[in-house]
Regions:
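Bacterial N-terminal signal peptides
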Residues: 11-22
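Soluble extramembrane regions of membrane proteins in the secretory/endomembrane system
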Residues: 21-183
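Bacterial N-terminal signal peptides that target proteins for export
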Residues: 1-12
Length: 183
């Protein structure tokens, strides 16, 4: 018995046929060897403080979760709080994913706390026309803390810088000079 298709059945059959042809004509997925690696970009264009700290740490954490090939941490900062800087450095050093610290664009700087962050990266890069350094610790408000306390703070900052400059194979004397020299 030959039965005619209803308009609904005919429309359904046409949709299925269309989808079958669309799927067949689709480009095949690339082999796993051709999948492009993911690089997570995080821009720190701010003073180093708790909000920017959380932003950077979240970006590094995300890169680790998705097994990214790398994190590109673009820096343009005058520096900031030591506590936030140390937390960012700790996140960089403990990351399973390599972190590339990059001072950019031209005209940017990674001064003070930014210098520590720059040198903590697995790879530290600077665009032409950028600068870094001036990482000598200063007190907020310029309070006089006395020579002994000032020396202790400077020695602690220099030891901290030395610890990851050595780990990353950087010029330790130059890194330490960025902390100890005041001018």
């Amino acid at each position: 018995m030959n039965r005619r298709l209803t308009p609904v059945e005919l429309g359904f059959a046409a949709c299925l046929t269309f989808l079958a042809f669309r799927l067949a004509a689709r480009e095949p997925l690339p082999p796993a060897s051709e999948v492009r690696p993911v690089v997570v970009e995080v821009d720190l264009d701010d003073v180093v403080q708790p909000v920017s700290e959380e932003y950077v740490k979240r970006g590094i954490s995300y890169a680790n979760q998705v097994n990214a090939a790398a994190v590109l941490l673009e820096l343009s900062t005058p520096g900031g709080l030591e506590s936030s800087m140390r937390n960012i450095v700790q996140a960089i050093i403990s990351s399973r994913v390599p972190v590339i610290t990059y001072v950019a664009p031209s005209g940017s700087r990674a001064a003070s706390a930014g210098f520590f962050i720059l040198l903590s990266g697995d790879v530290a890069v600077m665009s032409p026309g950028t600068n870094t350094g001036a990482a000598h610790p200063v007190m907020i408000g310029g309070a006089d803390i006395g020579k002994t306390m000032e020396a202790k703070i400077e020695n602690d900052a220099a030891a901290y810088m030395r610890s990851f400059a050595e780990k990353r194979g950087r010029n330790v004397q130059l890194a330490e000079a960025g902390v100890r020299e005041r001018e």
